[in-house]
């Protein structure tokens, strides 16, 4: 497929996402809103977009106000739709839930509508990340050349739909991206970097090359069977825990956007019990279960690369 054809498909798919989201928000407003609860988080400014989040103050919204915020959030796809001071790199998050009363027919209609939106979003992400054939650093420029101001993460994010929950609870998750590597795999990566000299601010080209050579020597000095691990922290994120009484099971979802809960009164379902979201405080985290951590020694800080002792 030619690059021109891919761009045509990219634009066409995005227009469909916009149209289907507009139709969904109109459709939802035709249904009876049983309960709505969303939690707005402080906006991240451009100056603070890379700063760690030690505290997050939550503001709760209920009822029709919550619904209006949520429906607007689903269609928030461009930086032009937000304050000039807000970071375009930090994700815009609005955890919460909208609960609508449905019957069998309207439940199926909404399920199909949301499934179609999620399919389009997945297709759009596939075009950008796979079909474009571009490295991650070049994708931003390519996408924004054709869709100026697009917040790509908001375009990728699928909608979470649940049916007849008994309880919904919200909380925070601290996670790490973890990847296990062999010594030879790390050496191979460093060789590639050494073969393509460049400057990385604040270092000059020569300083950066020297830094890479030191890193290579440090890794080469390890035993071949050394266990290496990338353990990179991810910014804290809101989550939801859904309890289904009939199935006696709990399901956890990431919750960057409001969940859509359909309550089917034809099947005798009732309004779920919905909890709040507490302010986040990194110094006051309570772990339900924290397994014994493997002893690790940081060896290349910029890569978050550790060696198991």
Swiss-Prot record:
GO molecular function, one term: DNA binding
InterPro entries listed in its UniProt record: DNA_replication_term_site-bd (IPR008865), Tus_dom1 (IPR036381), Tus_sf (IPR036384)
Ribonucleoprotein in keyword set: no
Gene Ontology biological-process annotations: DNA replication termination
Cited Pfam families: Ter
One Gene Ontology cellular component annotation held by this UniProt entry: cytoplasm
Annotated localization: Cytoplasm
Protein keywords: Cytoplasm, DNA replication, DNA-binding
Task of the protein: Trans-acting protein required for termination of DNA replication. Binds to DNA replication terminator sequences (terA to terF) to prevent the passage of replication forks. The termination efficiency will be affected by the affinity of this protein for the terminator sequence.
Family: Belongs to the Tus family.
Name the record gives this protein: DNA replication terminus site-binding protein
């Amino acid at each position: 497929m030619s690059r021109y054809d891919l761009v045509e498909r990219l634009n066409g798919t995005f227009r469909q996402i916009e149209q289907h989201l507009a139709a969904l928000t109109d459709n939802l407003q035709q249904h009876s809103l049983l309960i709505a609860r969303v939690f707005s988080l402080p906006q991240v400014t451009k100056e603070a977009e890379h700063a760690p989040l030690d505290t997050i103050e939550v503001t709760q919204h209920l009822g029709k106000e919550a619904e209006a915020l949520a429906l607007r959030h689903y269609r928030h796809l461009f930086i032009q739709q937000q304050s000039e001071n807000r970071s375009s790199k930090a994700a815009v998050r609005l955890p919460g839930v909208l609960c609508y009363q449905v019957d069998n027919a309207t439940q199926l209609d909404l399920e199909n509508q949301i499934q179609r939106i999620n399919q389009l979003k997945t297709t759009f992400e596939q075009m950008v990340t796979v079909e474009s054939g571009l490295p991650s650093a070049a994708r931003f420029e390519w996408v924004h050349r054709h869709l100026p101001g697009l917040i790509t993460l908001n375009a990728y994010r699928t909608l979470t739909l649940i049916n007849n929950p008994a309880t919904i609870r919200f909380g925070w998750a601290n996670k790490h991206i973890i990847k296990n590597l062999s010594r030879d795999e790390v050496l191979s990566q460093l060789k590639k970097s050494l073969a393509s000299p460049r400057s990385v601010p604040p270092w000059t080209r020569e300083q950066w090359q020297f830094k890479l050579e030191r890193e290579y020597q440090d890794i080469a000095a390890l035993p071949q069977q050394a266990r290496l691990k990338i353990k990179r922290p991810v910014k804290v994120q809101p989550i939801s825990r859904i309890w289904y009484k009939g199935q006696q099971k709990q399901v956890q979802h990431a919750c960057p956007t409001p969940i859509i809960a359909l309550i089917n009164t034809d099947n005798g379902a009732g309004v779920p019990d919905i909890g709040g979201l507490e302010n986040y405080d990194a110094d006051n985290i309570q772990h339900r279960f924290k397994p014994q951590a493997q002893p690790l020694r940081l060896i290349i800080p910029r890569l978050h690369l550790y060696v198991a002792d």
